[in-house]
């Protein structure tokens, strides 16, 4: 449950009306309403008052939001948070990284978490800059002290958490070995850069991937469009066995092939399916693979 759901749950469990709860912790009924519908967030003093009223810890009250952002097993880490007050488009520029996770979660803040088992000076060598410009948030990762992109590709792991209710369009630029995009529902996600492996799970979006490396793309679950743009590359796209999709190719000298149980087969796309795969580019090949059950 989200924080607002937790507050509602414990209030009802205690048999309290919003007005009665407000009296007990010394706030207005309107404050309780805002906390429960997600238009407001209690500060730390009020979180403590709520926890005390319901005889639970603040950690228990926040347990769901914390569980979505699991603790890392890395030696070094750095986290940057920023409060968001409404729906935003995101322009994210990361440069090089070993792995990047882009996730939606139930919370109020955007968080950029960096991990490494190598960088002792992670806090000094990498700085996250977040600019809030009207309806857009720019996130830039800057390197200092001669930290190189080559080093980042060897050992820097980045996880970006974006609040579910504030996600607009996303543009991500990154050069990474692996990229995971999870649980994002929005109009459009555009990915640019050099990426070797991509995993998509639980998304509802039009996802566009522009990369000229040979890629391994795994779709565990996805609703919407997937557009792949490549130049002189050969990539593989693995889909669940029961995944219905229609497909098309555009560009110059592009080809789509199909594979099942390790063998090339005829086109098994479905012209009536809602999910859509588009392959575009120049002198490139895409092999669509049906995952083995």
Which positions does each model-derived feature cover?
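Short basic helix-loop element that most often maps to the first helix and adjoining turn
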Residues: 5-24
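Conserved hydrophobic/aromatic packing and binding residues within compact polymer-binding modules
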Residues: 7, 21-22, 32-35, 61
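Short acidic/polar N-terminal linker immediately downstream of export determinants
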Residues: 13-14, 63-121, 150-154, 261-272
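Recognition helix of helix-turn-helix/homeodomain-like DNA-binding domains
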Residues: 27-41, 64-66
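DNA major-groove recognition helix of helix-turn-helix/homeodomain DNA-binding modules
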Residues: 45-60
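Right-handed parallel beta-helix
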Residues: 81-85, 89, 121-204, 216, ...
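Short, surface-exposed interaction patches in beta-rich subdomains
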Residues: 142, 200-293
